[in-house]
A protein has these predicted regions:
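Compositional signal for N-terminal targeting/processing segments
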Residues: 1-224
């Protein structure tokens, strides 16, 4: 069975628990939610002269210029996963849609937001949690837990709740399904390369764990 570890980006607890999870599992390959066309940039993360925080900037060349910034701190789970792979001479890859696709998504989203106020799934979660906000909810229930298993299980539940809410927003959820189908395809490709399921760890936002666990059924085809 493929090992999945759901995170929250820029979560110190996630970075800590993930590093120790990798120490326990000793995978032969680690797949990370991140633009797959930026894999060449990963080599610079652990360069002796590179000191976090760092970021990768993707941009268009035609006016109006569109940009997307991918930030990483030392306490980013993704950064710690890359660090572990470097230390243990383990293959590490980003598996999400290429950044140029996200740039196209952002342009489409901007046009949509001009027509209507953006629906915020986190506001809906805040109402359900009874907290001052989802940040407070996360801090209280997950960020301070010292139990790695409790963190992992808690993030999955948190992600499932987000998915249930976003399904009410069909256009946003459709984008999610495309991303997950692409990432599922990347997982399937790794299996075809000869890796066993138990040798793989997939690091992704907690929101996507449930969608990616169905990788055998929903992976993207060549035509798609």
């Amino acid at each position: 069975m493929v090992n999945f570890f759901g995170i929250r980006h820029l979560s110190p607890a996630g970075a800590y628990h993930l590093y120790h999870f990798l120490e326990e599992k000793k995978p032969k390959i680690v797949l990370i939610e991140g633009p797959s066309d930026l894999n060449e940039q990963m080599q610079y993360f652990m360069h002796p002269e590179t000191k976090p925080p760092i970021a990768i900037l993707s941009y268009t060349k035609q006016s109006p210029i569109k940009t997307i910034l991918y930030p990483y701190a030392e306490y980013s789970p993704e950064y710690q996963a890359i660090r572990w792979c470097k230390e243990n001479k383990t293959i590490c890859r980003f598996i999400d849609l290429p950044s140029k696709v996200f740039l196209a998504f952002s342009e489409k989203r901007e046009k949509q937001e001009q027509k209507e106020e953006q629906w915020n799934v986190y506001e809906q979660l805040d109402k359900q949690s009874g907290e001052d906000g989802h940040e407070t909810f996360w801090e209280r229930t997950l960020e301070h837990t010292q139990d790695a298993l409790a963190y992992q299980q808690g993030t999955e539940v948190f992600g499932k709740n987000l998915r249930e809410l976003e399904q009410q927003r069909e256009e946003d959820y459709a984008e999610t399904l495309v991303r997950e189908a692409f990432m599922c395809r990347k997982i399937a490709d790794v299996i075809k390369e000869g890796f066993k399921e138990e040798e793989i760890v997939v690091v992704t936002g907690a929101y996507h764990v449930e969608g990616l666990k169905c990788w055998k059924e929903v992976s993207m085809t060549d035509t798609q």
